[in-house]
Regions:
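Hydrophobic transmembrane alpha-helices of multi-pass small-molecule transport proteins
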Residues: 96-113, 237-256
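Juxtamembrane C-cap of transmembrane helices in multi-pass membrane transport proteins
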Residues: 1-7, 56-67, 73, 137-148, ...
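Juxtamembrane helix-entry segments on the extracytoplasmic side of multipass membrane proteins
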Residues: 14, 36-40, 113-132, 171-187, ...
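Membrane-interface interhelical linkers
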Residues: 21-46, 95, 152, 160-187, ...
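C-terminal transmembrane-helix exit sites in multi-pass transporters
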Residues: 60, 77-99, 220-239
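Hydrophobic/small/kink-forming positions within alpha-helical transmembrane segments
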Residues: 25, 48-56, 78-83, 108-109, ...
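Helix-helix packing/entry segments at the starts of transmembrane helices
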Residues: 71-76, 148-160, 196-227
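Transmembrane alpha-helical segments that form core, pore/gating elements
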Residues: 2-5, 9, 24, 116-177, ...
Length: 270
């Protein structure tokens, strides 16, 4: 998305979701089933609205803030997801879960090193709203997964909704694109498609408190791509952050594994 240059936020959002909508549509056509699960429409609409607002706010923040600042604000999403899951889905997170998320967030701070200034208050607010929207969207996805809604339908409904809502603004504020810009936007859309299917599948099968820590692995991949495409070599603070994030993820994995083995043992005794 950064390589696509200075294009309107709505235009970037439209192309970002267009590819995902087409891919999900092809999957549904192959399955020959466009039917929604009973009672899933309200959650699909809420997921789509929250996700669309989250994307627009995040892209606005990226365009008006330092990329590092926009990234750290988007990393608020797991916090919001755990809060929404507790409020809306009545999921309980232990103090260990909360502590690990805070530790992972601290690791992200080491990597991103945000530097806010007073003049950037509105874009920063938009970035925080982007994290809130993403967190609510993840919560809705987990709820829909519990109702048996298919991943392809969730991705298609959201992507189509986002494209349709962005289309009028894209037409009004359309900026001509060069072939490289169009190629980068389509490539971003393809990458987003893979990410959407993966994240939707993950949040469909597990609660936010079990997934949120792993969301910070994105920081590691961002560093890899930054080095590959922009020759951005991480400093010592970044490496400290990587160690904190990976450590939190490993501890979370071990805790989840221990809990699962304990639950299985309890079931066998019954």
């Amino acid at each position: 998305m950064r390589l696509s240059g200075d294009l309107p936020t709505f235009q970037k959002s439209f192309f970002r979701n267009l590819v995902a909508a087409l891919v999900a549509c092809c999957v549904l056509i192959k399955e020959k089933n466009f039917r929604l699960q009973k009672g899933s429409l309200p959650a699909l609409l809420l997921r789509s609205v929250a996700g669309t607002v989250g994307i627009v706010c995040n892209f606005y923040a990226i365009d008006h803030l330092a990329v590092a600042d926009a990234s750290i604000l988007n990393k608020l999403a797991p916090f919001f997801s755990i809060v929404f899951s507790a409020l809306l889905l009545k999921e309980r997170a232990s103090w260990k879960d909360w502590l690990l998320v805070v530790i992972a967030f601290s690791g992200a701070l080491f990597v991103i090193k945000p530097t806010f200034s007073l003049s950037e208050s509105f874009p920063a607010l938009m970035g925080a709203l982007g994290g809130l929207g993403a967190g609510l969207a993840y919560t809705c996805v987990h709820y829909l997964g519990g109702k048996g809604e298919r991943t392809a339908m969730i991705v298609f409904f959201f992507s189509a909704f986002s494209c349709l809502s962005m289309l009028p603004f894209t037409i009004i504020y359309f900026t001509p694109m060069s072939l490289p810009q169009l190629a980068f936007l389509l490539l971003a859309g393809a990458s987003a498609s893979v990410a959407q299917f993966s994240v939707t599948k993950a949040y469909s099968f597990a609660p936010a408190k079990d997934i949120s820590v792993y969301d910070y692995s994105q920081v590691l991949f961002s560093a890899i791509w930054g080095l590959a495409f922009f020759t951005e070599l991480p400093d010592i603070w970044s490496f400290i952050g990587y160690a904190v994030i990976i450590g939190a993820a490993i501890v979370k994995f071990l805790l989840s594994k221990t809990k699962h083995e304990k639950d299985v043992g309890t079931d066998e005794l019954k």
